[in-house]
Amino acid sequence: MGIFHTVDDNEIKSGENTDIYFVRTSDILALEGKNPVVTVEITAQNLPDEWGVFCGLDDALSLLEGLPVDVYAMPEGSIFYRGEPVIRISGHYRDFAKYETSLLGFICHASGIATSAAIIKACAAQRPVYSFGSRRQHPAISRMIERSAWVGGVDGASSTSAPAGIPLAGTMPHAFVMCFEKPLDAWLAFDRHAPGDVPRVMLCDTYCDEKREALDAAKAGASAVRLDTPSSRKGDMRQILEEVRWELDINGFPDVGIFLSGGLTADDILKYRDIVDAFGVGGSIANAQVIDFSLDIVEIEEKIYSKRGKKSGVKEVYEFDNGDHLLLPKGVTPPEDAKPMIKIFIKDGQILTKPDMQKSRARVLSSIENMI
């Protein structure tokens, strides 16, 4: 046992981290001599928005590697819609039944974060968005949070646990400013000692009026000023931003940007994106609503089945150049210009290919350009 309340990799990989009814199901099926060949599909019947971003495939493949199954899936970073299968598994049911809990956990959580990040990134209209929310979740999953946010399109992350290849971004906390006699001393110290490649973004709302501190920071050499209390201000945040921008411009600092953070939502970004140069987003990404995926049998011993409320039979998803999707039963010929989205990733337990985080992110960014 570790010192923290976390589940280790071995418990997940062995299938020990599961719901108890899967243990009982497997035991009783074994006693009855039943282990049918089935095909299951993972779909979401309800989404937080009109579309979702599929994420978490990397962990899902690592979980299923070595099991006697075939796994098909949409590429990570694919846009998907309600009722579309994102993963399909074929094999003897008892060989993978106990892995359902972890499998769904991997993709439900990661896809929820990636989806929220993609929506926020689309709302930002080309302005940088940084993930500041790993502190809003258990530290054991901070790497997953930052990876999922990156796949969703953010431009950097604050957590030092972010996977390699994700730029780290962060300015300074209020505590840093408060350790000095006055904000100016803090900003000058930061400028003296921070690495040269770290932008001189100065936090400007610790003690005084934002526009006063912003102007002082600009005079001290700030490349941008960061405002971090939009949700706690009793005044009109729009007015505050306009005043800061006005004072910077009229005093000869038009190139000093405004960085906004602090409880931001997608609606906030839509409201402020015309005047703000970059955003730091915490809980709206890290605490995103999970995608409510479910795993359902659609075929048993090559015969189509479904439970009530689900569509029976194996399905394929096709995508057109304009981004539209088409769902068809397997075996039905699609239109010539429709491209199949579901690919094979595991054959007889062997991984054929794994997601590339950078390609997954590029797939999202190319898809969301005109979505908001």
Regions from the language model: what does each represent?
Residues D27, P36-I42, P128, V198-R200, ...:
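Structural beta-strand/beta-sheet cores of well-ordered domains, especially the beta-sheet scaffolds
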Residues V40, V69, I87, Y130, ...:
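A broad, low-specificity signal marking well-ordered, structured residues that form hydrophobic/aromatic
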Residues M1-R94:
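Flexible, solvent-exposed loop/hinge segments and secondary-structure transition points
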Residues M1-F22, E32-K34, D49-W51, L61, ...:
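Gly/Ser/Thr/Ala-enriched C-terminal appendages of enzymes
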Residues G33-V37, L64-L67, R82, A124-R127, ...:
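A generic structural signal for short, non-catalytic loop/turn and secondary-structure boundary residues
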Residues P48, S78-F80, I87-F253, A266-D267, ...:
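Buried, small/hydrophobic-residue-enriched core segments of structured protein domains
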